[in-house]
């Protein structure tokens, strides 16, 4: 039996998924993670700060270039229809996601990250709520099971801040310049449209 377990473990392919709630493509990618799992990928979710990645790489948000921004919104709608994922453009975009992403690190520590991601992504990209409002943010976090007082206290703690910084620096060191970004060992895949190549590699 141990031999079978060893073989199964050695065949597991680890995929690291880096995301930020402020990225609508991260929302689509999160909802599409099952396709990676079904192809044999063991997914490790890594909250990162997109702003930190942009700063380190000199990249700019697509919406800062008018025509690029206009195209991006069309493209997201195409992808949401193709993947059959509900999507509504958030009128409060851009969402400044530092506290949201620190909350994700906290949720990961508390073993409720996927629940937290579900309610947070839904609030931003389906219900189109104003997640720049601290009170709304705290209420959404509470829906995932985080006590509001704990949330407020912990997202200001050095432990949580440092972990998010480490995650972001890891992604940058591996070549990230945006999100969603996936890593299969040292191979990087960026964007929702690269998932098909990731799935091909997983099936090899």
What are the residue ranges of the model-derived segments?
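Short, surface-exposed alpha-helical recognition segments that flank or form part
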Residues: 1, 21, 64-67, 155
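Short, Lys/Arg-enriched N-terminal segments with co-localized hydrophobic residues
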Residues: 1-10
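Generic detector of short, locally flexible boundary/turn motifs and exposed helical patches
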Residues: 10-12, 52-55, 67-70, 80-82, ...
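Short, solvent-exposed beta-strand edge segments and adjacent coil->beta transition regions
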Residues: 12-14, 100
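C-terminal cap of thioredoxin/glutaredoxin-like
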Residues: 14-16, 21-44, 119-204
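Structural alpha/beta surface segment adjacent to cysteine/selenocysteine redox centers
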Residues: 25-127
């Amino acid at each position: 039996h141990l031999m079978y377990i060893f073989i199964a473990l050695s065949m597991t392919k680890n995929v690291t998924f880096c995301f930020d709630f402020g990225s609508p493509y991260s929302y689509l990618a999160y909802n599409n993670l099952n396709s990676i799992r079904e192809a044999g990928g063991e997914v490790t979710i890594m909250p990162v700060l997109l702003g930190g990645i942009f700063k380190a790489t000199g990249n700019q948000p697509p919406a800062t270039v008018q025509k690029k921004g206009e195209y991006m919104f069309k493209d997201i709608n195409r992808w949401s229809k193709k993947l059959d994922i509900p999507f509504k453009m958030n009128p409060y975009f851009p969402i400044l996601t530092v506290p949201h992403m620190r909350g994700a690190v906290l949720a990961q520590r508390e073993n409720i990250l996927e629940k937290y991601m579900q309610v947070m992504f839904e609030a931003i990209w389906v219900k189109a709520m104003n997640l720049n409002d601290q009170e709304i943010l705290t209420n959404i976090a509470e829906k995932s099971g985080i006590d509001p007082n704990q949330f407020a206290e912990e997202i200001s703690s050095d432990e949580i801040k440092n972990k998010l910084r480490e995650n972001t620096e890891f992604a940058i060191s591996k070549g990230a310049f945006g999100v969603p970004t996936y890593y299969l060992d040292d191979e990087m895949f960026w964007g929702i449209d690269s998932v098909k190549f990731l799935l091909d590699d997983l099936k090899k």
